[in-house]
From Swiss-Prot:
One of its GO terms (molecular function) is structural constituent of ribosome. Belongs to the eukaryotic ribosomal protein eS28 family. GO terms for biological process: maturation of SSU-rRNA; ribosomal small subunit assembly; translation. This is Small ribosomal subunit protein eS28. It comes from Eremothecium gossypii (strain ATCC 10895 / CBS 109.51 / FGSC 9923 / NRRL Y-1056). One of its GO terms (cellular component) is cytosolic small ribosomal subunit. Gene3D superfamilies: Nucleic acid-binding proteins (2.40.50.140). PROSITE patterns: RIBOSOMAL_S28E. Keywords: Ribonucleoprotein, Ribosomal protein. The gene is RPS28A. Pfam families: Ribosomal_S28e. InterPro entries: NA-bd_OB-fold, Ribosomal_eS28, Ribosomal_eS28_CS.
């Protein structure tokens, strides 16, 4: 990772469910640490639980909701 790449820190506030063909992706709602009034839904690969801090390379894209 380049040291000049801007990143955004986000805290997992709720785990919404598993998705992906084999359940390897978790859909979570995150709250940005620099702007706590803003929350988005993201897909996360790998183990994740509430109160984890994620480093987002891109913070504008939001995941589609599970059905």
């Amino acid at each position: 990772m380049d040291s000049k790449t801007p990143v955004t820190l986000a805290k997992v506030i709720k785990v919404l469910g598993r998705t992906g063909s084999r359940g390897g992706v978790t859909q979570v709602r995150v709250e940005f640490l620099d702007d706590t009034s803003r929350t988005i839904v993201r897909n996360v690969k790998g183990p994740v639980r509430e109160n984890d801090i994620l480093v987002l390379m891109e913070s504008e894209r939001e995941a589609r909701r599970l059905r």
